[in-house]
Amino acid sequence: MLVVNVSRTWPLVPGDMSAEESVLGDWAALNEAKLHQYGDAIIAVADGTVVAAYDIQGWERLENGRVRFAGRLSGRWAPLIGMPSPVTWTQGAARPVRYL
């Protein structure tokens, strides 16, 4: 499972960015081996709370090296929504992705 920090992009104002774009959007510096090992689900965290959960159906590496996921809302991980994040980030942390 990947846990991503979407605090900067989570759609607080409808129309700015969809939840799907925020969570599945383009992520930098993801290792191929770790994608294969942990790439079954993606949990999104905003301000310390789980806000979305997706089952990953696939992914593509873009020309700029970033990874874009394809996925669907997860029934299995949906109960985590509204719960505290399973991982923590320190303020100013550069890596918005954690592997769990």
Language-model features, listed with the residues they occupy:
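Short beta-strand-centered aromatic/proline hotspots
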Residues: 51-60
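Compositionally biased, charged N-terminal/linker segments
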Residues: 1-39, 45-50, 76-100
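Short, solvent-exposed secondary-structure boundary/capping segments
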Residues: 61-74
